[in-house]
Amino acid sequence: MVGNGGCFCRKICYNSVILFEGEPDLKLSRLVFPPDGASRGTLRAHRAYLAVLLTLLGVGIGFLGLWLTACADAALPQAELYRSYLDHPLLLALNLFPPLLLAWLGYFLSGRCWCGVLLSGLFGVGLPLINYYKVMLRGDPMRASDILLLRTAGGIMSQYEFERTAEVNMAVALLGAMLAFAVLLMPRGDKRRRARALGAAACVLLGVVAYLGAYTDEAVY
C-alpha cells in the first residue's frame, strides 16, 4: 500500500511539472490574467483554469434552473420535488447537459467565457423563469410547443402584472453573480480560431446526437 501510494504521488508531481513546465513560480494573478508572451506552461494552466470554472458555471446554471422549476408551483412540496431531480442520476444529467453544452458553445463561438455563461443562462434560467410565471398565471407548465407561440404569448402576457417573488430575485441575482464572475475573473479566452471552430462543431454534434437519442426517447426522458 505504501509503495502504491508513493507511485501515485510521484505521478501527480510528474504531471504537475509537465503542466506548469516553464513557469515554476506561477502565481494566481498570472494564472487568471496571463501576460502577453506567457510560457506554454502558463497558458496550459490558464486553459485548465477556464475549463474547470466554465464547466462548474454551466452545471451551476443547470441546478439553478432546476431549483426555479421546483419553485414554480407553490401547491407542490418544493424540497421534495427538487430532491426528486437529484434522486435520478440519468434525469439529472439530461437536465444539466443543455446549459453545460451551451456554455461551452458560447465560449467556442466567441472566445469569451462570459458569452458562454450568458448563452447558458438565457436557456438554463430564462426558460425556467418563463415556466415559473406560466405556472403561476395559467396553472400549467411550459411545453416545447409554447416556443412556437411566443409572439401570441407576448400579447397575452402584456395583460398580466408580474410579481417579483423572492425565488425570482434570487435566481436573477445568482445568475448575475455568475456572469460578473466570468467577466471579471475569466476575461481572456482561447485565441486559437481553429481549435474553437472544432470545439463549436463538436458541441453542435453532441447536441444533435443527444436530441435524436436520449431527449426524444420517452423511455429515457
Predicted regions and their residues:
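Short, positively charged low-complexity motifs
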Residues: L19-L26
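Transmembrane and membrane-interface helices of multi-pass
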Residues: Y14, K27-Y221
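Residue-identity detector for glycine
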Residues: G3-G6, G22, G37, G41
